[in-house]
Amino acid sequence: MDTKHIKISDYNYSLPDERIAKFPIAQRDHSKLLVYKHGVVSDDVFYHLPDYLPKGALMIFNNTKVIQARMHFRKETGALIEVFLMEPAAPTDYELMFQTTGHCSWLCMVGNLKKWKDGSLKRDFEIKGHSLTLSATMRRGEAGADGKAAPLAVGGGTNYWIDFDWDNENISFAEILEAVGELPIPPYLNRETQESDKTTYQTVYSKIKGSVAAPTAGLHFTDAVLADLDAHGIDREEVTLQVGAGTFKPVKSLEIEGHQMHTEYIVVHRRSLEKLLHHDCQVIAVGTTSVRTIESLYYMGVHLLKHPEVNEEDLHVKQWDPYDDGRDGGLVDDITPMQAIQAIVDYLDKNGLEALHSSTQIIIAPGYTYKIVKMLVTNFHQPQSTLLLLVSAFLHGDWHQVYDYALCHDFRFL
C-alpha cells in the first residue's frame, strides 16, 4: 500500500454529537468493552478486560499526567488573553521545569493574539497566604517600519516563546500552575472545564507531569482492574509520552502525505526495556500514545545499530522513518525487535544512562507493519484522524466492522 497517498476521506464515518462521551460514567471501569478477535466482534464490561488477556503478557501504560496548561490574563483594556503551554523551552526538561522557581520559558499557543501587541501580561493571585504577581512576556522579532515588533513564532508558526516571571523564589512553577492554571480538555467535548475534571481526566496511574491531554484509553482503568491484571499474571510496565495538543490536529490535506505530524517527547527507563526483552517484545499497549512510544523504540534501535555513534537527540523518529524512504530504509526486515531493543539497552550502558529521553513524530497508518505491539486497548477515535489510521493499520483495514458494531450497540465515543 502507498501509505503517503491514502485519502483521509476514506476514513470518515458519521458520529452524532450525542454519542460523544462528554463526561465519564460514575464508575470508570463499568464502561462498555468491545472485543475484536480473529475477525469476530463481541461486547462486555471493561472490568472483565483481564479475562481476555494471555497470562504472562506484558501490558504497557503511559504514566503521563495532564497539567493545568491553560492560563488566562486580562489586559488593562479588558481584553482576555489565553496562554496555552505547549512545550518547555527553558529549561527543556519537564521535571526540572516544574521544579524551577522565579523564572521559566515555554512555547505556547496564544488565544486572542491580536490584542497582545506589546508589553507583559500580569496576573495577581495568592499561594499559601502569599500574594504573588505572575508576568508573561512574549519574545518578539525586530521592529518593522511602523516601529512595532511582531511576535516571534516557532514550531511552524503556531507557537510563541513566552517568558514567565513571578516574585517569589520559594514558589515552584508547578505550584503556579496549580494556583492559576486550568486543566485543558479535548475540543471535541465542546464544554468548559469543570472542577471534577482534575480527577476524572487523569488516569489512576498518572505520575509524570507534562501532557496537555490525557491518554484517554487509560481512563477506564481502576485500582481494582489493575489488581485483577496482577491476579491474572499480566506483567505491567510504564513509559512516558507527553501528549501534546497536536494529537487533536485535524488532517486537512486530501492525502496524508500533506499532513505534518506533531512531535511528542518520550522517556523509557532501562527497566522497561529489559521487560520488553524478557517478554520477547510481545506487548499489549494501553492507548495510542503507548503504541507510538513502543513502536518508535524499534526505529531508534535500528538507527543505533546502523549508526552506533549517534547522540540521543539524533534518535528522534521522523514521520516517515518507518516507510520505504525512511532514513534507515524504512521496512528493515533484517533487524528483529529484540535486536533493536537490545541496541538501546547497550546504548544506555555505554553512556551510563538509566533512561532514554527522546522524541517521536511517527505516523502509523495502513501500510505500516507493527513490530512490537500485539494487542491494543484503545478508545474510539474521531473520523478522519491520524489515530483512526493507527487503528486501521492494527486491524488490517477492518475498522469499519468494529466502528459500525460500536455505533449500533450504544458505545460511547472519544
Question: Which residues does each predicted region cover?
Answer:
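Surface-exposed, charge/polar-rich loops and edge strands
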Residues: 1-142, 147-414
